[in-house]
């Protein structure tokens, strides 16, 4: 569970290649990047491998900001694993849950 704060805008380039569209307002950007963070955090926990790289190996290839369902991947030498992600939004907080496809 993660609280939506403007700090995420400074951190985003460290954990995702995704960039908000130029016409997206700041509040929506904060929510979108927080959602990405919670998705990657959930993927990292399910991967349970210290060698997994947060930026490179935890991917949301077709991320749609604030969509409640997303597809995600964990890439690794043994083969990629696909996951379905559900995100939940409540009063300035976001959390995401990952399940295998």
Please describe what each predicted stretch is:
Residues 2-101:
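Core catalytic alpha/beta fold that binds nucleotide/phospho-ligands
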